[in-house]
From Swiss-Prot:
Name of this protein: Proto-oncogene Wnt-1
Protein encoded by which gene: Wnt1
Tissues with expression: Testis and mid-gestational embryos. In the testis, detected only in postmeiotic germ cells undergoing differentiation from round spermatids into mature spermatozoa. In the embryos, expression is restricted to the developing CNS in regions of the neural tube other than the telencephalon. Expressed in osteoblast; expression levels increase with advancing osteoblast differentiation. Expressed in the brain, femur, spleen, and hematopoietic bone marrow.
GO CC annotation: cell surface; endoplasmic reticulum lumen; extracellular region; Wnt signalosome
GO MF assignments: cytokine activity; protein domain specific binding; receptor ligand activity; signaling receptor binding
Subcellular location field: Secreted, Extracellular space, Extracellular matrix; Secreted
Post-translational events: Palmitoleoylation is required for efficient binding to frizzled receptors. Palmitoleoylation is necessary for proper trafficking to cell surface. Depalmitoleoylated by NOTUM, leading to inhibit Wnt signaling pathway.
A Pfam family this chain is assigned to: wnt
InterPro entries linked: Wnt (IPR005817), Wnt1 (IPR009139), Wnt_C (IPR043158), Wnt_CS (IPR018161)
Function: Ligand for members of the frizzled family of seven transmembrane receptors. Acts in the canonical Wnt signaling pathway by promoting beta-catenin-dependent transcriptional activation. In some developmental processes, is also a ligand for the coreceptor RYK, thus triggering Wnt signaling. Plays an essential role in the development of the embryonic brain and central nervous system (CNS). Has a role in osteoblast function, bone development and bone homeostasis.
Signal sequence extent: 1-27
Organism: Mus musculus
Length: 370
């Protein structure tokens, strides 16, 4: 008789549940570990062509997986681009949600976005999408700027493009950005559960949005600006444009489950398919954000959920929208106070070359959630 059989039934059941949950918990904790390099300095990208020399690591680089470190070694100059793309993504996340209950809070250290990423909710979906998009965007732009040794502009578009224009110039290398982003960002995901599928899908949605928002730019050539012929190239969108699209997709995100209707014993092939929780809804497209868990209300502080609450947040007393005091303060009410502010005003440019301004003081009315 084995030791397991000697245990009381409630003990064996508890142990079994704990052991079953352990891989999922470990996978959740490993997701997004690479975000810890957000503030890394470009000077740490100490790379050489000699395979016998190792990448010099600072503590935050230890958060990268073996594959991620290998990709950094193989692409000199790319570490700064990845870190810069992540910083831009964080700023964009904060901008897009600045007037909502969840305002994309971040913290120093390896757990950049806090405990919310351990939940399969909409906010986690947006975080994964915007950070993936940020890396793809930054790497593609760095290629065309010549900052990465292993890539250049996208020169594949050459020759006539239309009756009065042709391809030329330096197109942003979105293909390299997407490929590197997929290899680097997705390799940080472990497991084969629904959370794993959700994160991979949202990572790809971020990259796809950068690609789909690219636009053609042209320059005219001809006598006296007659624009007889134009030279055109493909240009990346701003990350703000990408963030606007992803924010809209956050609002319309699809709640999903496994393609085999939620069984946690799906085959590998079945795991590659996500289906809407509501059978009446269309399956999520590659552009859509997906989630499987309801979001907290973010109204009050919760250490377990990692939510700060909205107490003390500034609100708009005249707005019926999400930034209004009624919604943002969760019905708790708000306080009003005045603040005297001194700002530069009536600035005048003097030739040459300085600007003179006056200091103007005015009273600002502030509304804060209770």
């Amino acid at each position: 008789m084995g030791l397991w059989a000697l245990l009381p039934s409630w003990v064996s059941t508890t142990l079994l549940l704990a052991l079953t949950a352990l891989p999922a918990a470990l996978a959740a904790n490993s997701s997004g570990r690479w975000w810890g390099i957000v503030n890394i300095a470009s000077s740490t990208n100490l790379l050489t062509d000699s395979k016998s020399l190792q990448l010099v690591l600072e503590p935050s680089l230890q958060l990268l997986s073996r594959k991620q470190r290998r990709l950094i070694r193989q692409n000199p100059g790319i570490l700064h681009s990845v870190s810069g793309g992540l910083q831009s993504a964080v700023r964009e996340c904060k901008w897009q949600f600045r007037n909502r209950r969840w305002n994309c809070p971040t913290a120093p250290g390896p757990h950049l976005f806090g405990k919310i990423v351990n939940r399969g909710c909409r906010e986690t979906a947006f975080i994964f999408a915007i950070t993936s998009a940020g890396v793809t965007h930054s790497v593609a732009r760095s290629c065309s700027e010549g900052s990465i040794e292993s890539c250049t502009c996208d020169y594949r578009r050459r020759g006539p493009g239309g009756p009065d224009w042709h391809w030329g110039g330096c197109s942003d290398n979105i293909d390299f950005g997407r490929l590197f982003g997929r290899e680097f960002v997705d390799s940080g995901e472990k497991g084969r559960d629904l959370r794993f599928l959700m994160n991979l899908h949202n990572n790809e949605a971020g990259r796809t949005t950068v690609f789909s928002e690219m636009r053609q730019e042209c320059k005219c050539h001809g006598m006296s600006g007659s624009c007889t012929v134009r030279t055109c190239w493909m240009r990346l969108p701003t990350l703000r444009a990408v963030g606007d699209v992803l924010r809209d997709r956050f609002d319309g995100a699809s709640r999903v489950l496994y393609g085999n209707r939620g069984s946690n014993r799906a085959s590998r092939a079945e795991l590659l398919r996500l289906e809407p929780e509501d059978p009446a809804h269309k399956p999520p497209s590659p552009h859509d954000l997906v989630y499987f868990e309801k979001s907290p209300n973010f109204c009050t502080y919760s250490g377990r959920l990692g939510t700060a609450g909205t107490a003390g947040r500034a609100c708009n007393s005249s707005s019926p929208a999400l930034d209004g005091c009624e919604l943002l303060c969760c019905g708790r009410g708000h306080r009003t106070r005045t603040q005297r502010v001194t700002e530069r005003c009536n600035c005048t440019f003097h030739w040459c070359c300085h600007v003179s301004c006056r200091n103007c003081t005015h009273t600002r009315v502030l509304h804060e959630c209770l």
